[in-house]
């Protein structure tokens, strides 16, 4: 521990001279008028334009100006630890700062500095709510400095996205950023692209995005030409008739399904198929998906049903992802299971992993409260060093030893009882669960104790009030049940958020309570004129919330849209300030927020995110995890240590728990095994994806060149020549395709190949019999076909020019080229995925699966070029143009 602290101090030491320099500038910066401050920032732009370098002088002045702008606009002054955090971000590293230390404000310091380059800055958050909140809140600082701020949201159209990407600083979610990148590489013209060249990116909750989400690629899909919903329904019916461990084996850890001999016999009997591995082998794929859907994917855990559609719940954030779909037919299998209309099946159009996407940025940085435990992975894969910033106040949270129970029932009973006992003291309680299903169960248990509580999970009716629920989770006697706390954004303040309480009071005063009652019951004095004016506005609660939201969350002094309401809000805030302070002190004396974890997660980082809600900014607080040996982590990765220990102690009373530092250490070791398991998976994904990354670079570069090319005719001619060469080669040597062919079969293949030529040269190629074809040698036949092609191509273009005009035809040809490229890339991705899934079996042949994958992947990519050319040629010449 001592060495770790010394190492962190050494890392921070290099930034201290700059911190001192920024502080020395503060006095002079404070004396600037608003106009002078903006002029000084403009001066930095000009200096950078000349030098193209962020010198220490420019960095210090920019940070100092941004700090002063923050204080003048939102009333917050970045302290020295926040300056350190900003400097770490600017150097392209990860800043670890505890919950409540002001990471959102920290990001403005390097963002404003890097924005002076004019090349754009992206600040990435985990959801639309945080992106909008931060862009609005922090946007006041940027606007004051003369910088423009953009916000990209999921519902925006292309032009609006483009406008926002071209601002100095853009707030956006990781998924929108990635999907826009994929879509930009499928556009038909440069004008349709919404992003510009990447420059600098700051990722909030960087470990959640670069590690937790690294296993799941971003996938753009297109509708498949084949859609057969009946097969999913049949597979679901068959799956429900099979018995686990009798008809099939299911591995919960790997999600693999394997059939027993008994199961195969039963499937063949039900399906009336003599051999399921014969021509009907494809049904097993659908059946495996159906079984997985029924046993591994649970409603209100992995997904919810929203608007009669399956909506995936993110396992790391607990949020609904309505536009996401499971791939490879799994989504359709779940729809069949839930008796929901099966949507059009899709095929991969394009994809990329976050691991490879974010490495596209020349300068990348991130911030989080829980990165140090994943420092090795972040540095080895992303070349991102983690620097821990010390807290501004002494850390006081107590992390109590875990309580381990023999079964789930005993654990949940103990959690409910613990809530009841702690609630008696008045301490606020936060109960963290891993799913909606489990949060519902905790709610049921607390109702038996007649305890009041708030629930925050993926259900839309709860998410609507997310910031209010989290903001008031620190109130006296409050109990809050929440699924995964990563990326919630709002801090839990002891005593509750003053802003949210005042909004509620405003609602009472303006909408419901008469002036006389307000004077007596609330002990407030409001002038009759002010109250009457507010009543005239006929504001509803949502309108009040909208008008004062910047005041409540961020302390802004003026609400432009409604000064009267702002005046009342400010008055209430002053009157309640001492009350909030006293309540916070009282709750601190009680012990602060008590965090209860209901199970250990796959990663210690996620557990620490939950713990981190207590003890913010020097507050008191404590945390404890309640676990059972039936929890998922022990089922999949645990050994028999705990079971043996319970047996040795002969504990007949289920309510007795094991609790000691040794047991907690054993739990930590189990969790470490889980983390290593998933790290190996992520590393494997990264290793295999390297080949796709190289292919993607080549493919996107080629596509970009085509976009820049105004005339595509030369590419079409060259492609046609290659296709004809291949056809001629096949015609003259049909045995290359198959062996042991009869003479009749050879002739049939020749005719089929020649028919391909007829499709290309329909306007010129005369009837030719087999005798003529066989009599011609390879070169003669090729030259003849090329001559016929030129004649046919001229006729084809003449008809097209007469039908749609020369310019439109050129655009048509370019569109065909791009369509063939996209089709080829999509096909290549599907083939690479098939190779990836099957290549693991090569290990049994004493071969390296990764080396074999790269070998076959190279061959597949080379074949993609041939397939693209064929697709292009037939796409162009299969179209008829009619002269009017």
From Swiss-Prot:
Its EC number is 7.4.2.8. It catalyses: ATP + H2O + cellular proteinSide 1 = ADP + phosphate + cellular proteinSide 2. It is a peripheral membrane protein. One of its GO terms (cellular component) is chloroplast thylakoid membrane. ATP binds at residues 82, 100-104, 491. It holds the Pfam family SecA_DEAD. It is an enzyme of class 7 (translocase). One of its GO terms (molecular function) is protein-exporting ATPase activity. GO terms for biological process: intracellular protein transmembrane transport; protein import; protein targeting. SMART domains: SecA_DEAD, SecA_PP_bind. It is found in: Plastid, Chloroplast stroma; Plastid, Chloroplast thylakoid membrane. Keywords: ATP-binding, Chloroplast, Membrane, Nucleotide-binding, Plastid, Protein transport, Thylakoid, Translocase, Translocation, Transport. InterPro entries: Helicase_ATP-bd, P-loop_NTPase, SecA, SecA_CS, SecA_DEAD, SecA_motor_DEAD, SecA_preprotein_X-link_dom, SecA_SF2_C. It comes from the Eukaryota. Belongs to the SecA family. Has a central role in coupling the hydrolysis of ATP to the transfer of proteins across the thylakoid membrane. This is Protein translocase subunit SecA. It comes from Olisthodiscus luteus. The lineage of its organism: Eukaryota, Sar, Stramenopiles, Ochrophyta, Olisthodiscophyceae.
